[in-house]
């Protein structure tokens, strides 16, 4: 599968792994407990990618191709100028920038890069769906309060059967409590191993547990103007590769606007007022169905602001506003 095919065709969240043409028979998911949750992006050669470094993070989260506001436990791909990512998208190597929610802008070598068209994260803070002005780095957005990671350590001498790079030890990062300092995978390096297998390897002896906010509370608070603290600066330093942290810094935060409604808050408010059950059902990255039990409409949009405006017009036409 190609990157653009993933964005246009895949609906649900998935664990995206790299698969290299130099080893067509290799399948990193063949021994996985959850192979149906794994998808592959094909690449020509792993040696053309950015080198791995000790301290790099792998985000323990599926990747969601949707770009409008929705409650989601995954990490997201904003609209951007770099449309040719390399390697595993959830691997925060030196060619990627992880942009946590609550962050408005960053500086790259004293050049300001600002996010646009912000939507609500599952923790209630805001993250951008469009980041223009940078071609050299690939951006990934995530939750600053609820993104678990593992960190890459030193090499052990063996080579990965998928990418042919040296295998590395890995250790728990954000979102984990652990009594064991480091772990090792078999056959494949951590960057080519499904995330559920990385976690299973850490938790099978009961030594590692997740440390995260309550999913139930976040889901309940999502339709209200409630948010967890803005921890974007701490998350930005913890998630990104140490190789780029001397030249890339968090510049400004964005706070939740108490005087405006996001699209999900608007729909929830109409449902409470009129005792309706309107839902936004995603079809793909640029199409949703807006409906309740009695009426519905297919909406094609190019960004979240466009979707918000069309839902406002639809609710007005249906005499709910």
From Swiss-Prot:
It comes from the Viruses. Belongs to the rotavirus B NSP1-2 family. This is Non-structural protein 1, peptide 2. It comes from Rotavirus B (isolate RVB/Human/China/ADRV/1982). The lineage of its organism: Viruses, Riboviria, Orthornavirae, Duplornaviricota, Resentoviricetes.
């Amino acid at each position: 599968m190609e990157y653009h095919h993933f964005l246009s065709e895949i609906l649900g969240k998935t664990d995206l792994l790299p698969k290299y043409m130099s080893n067509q028979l290799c399948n990193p998911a063949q021994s996985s407990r959850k192979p149906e949750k794994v998808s592959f992006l094909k690449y020509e050669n792993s040696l053309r990618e950015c080198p791995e470094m000790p301290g790099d993070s792998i985000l323990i989260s599926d990747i969601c191709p949707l770009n409008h506001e929705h409650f989601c436990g995954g990490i997201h791909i904003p609209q951007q100028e770099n449309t040719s990512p390399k390697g595993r998208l959830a691997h925060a190597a030196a060619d990627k920038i992880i942009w946590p929610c609550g962050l408005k802008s960053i500086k790259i070598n004293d050049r300001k890069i600002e996010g646009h068209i912000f939507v609500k994260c599952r923790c209630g803070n805001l993250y951008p769906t469009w980041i223009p002005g940078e071609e050299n780095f690939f951006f990934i957005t995530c939750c600053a309060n609820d993104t678990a990671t593992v960190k890459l350590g030193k090499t052990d001498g063996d080579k990965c059967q998928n990418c042919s790079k040296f295998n590395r030890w890995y250790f728990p990062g954000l979102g984990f409590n652990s009594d064991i300092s480091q772990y090792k995978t078999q056959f494949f390096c951590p960057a080519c191993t499904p995330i559920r297998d990385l976690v299973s390897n850490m938790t099978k002896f009961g030594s590692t547990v997740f440390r995260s906010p309550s999913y139930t509370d976040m889901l309940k608070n999502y339709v209200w103007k409630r948010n967890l603290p803005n921890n974007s600066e701490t998350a930005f330093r913890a998630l990104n590769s140490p190789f780029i942290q001397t030249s890339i810094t968090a510049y400004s935060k964005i706070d939740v606007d108490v005087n405006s409604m996001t699209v999900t808050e608007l729909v929830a408010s109409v449902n409470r007022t009129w005792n309706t059950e309107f839902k936004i059902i995603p079809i793909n990255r640029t199409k949703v169905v807006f409906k309740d039990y009695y009426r519905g409409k297919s909406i094609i949009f190019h960004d979240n602001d466009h979707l918000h405006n069309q839902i406002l017009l639809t609710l007005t036409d249906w005499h709910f506003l």
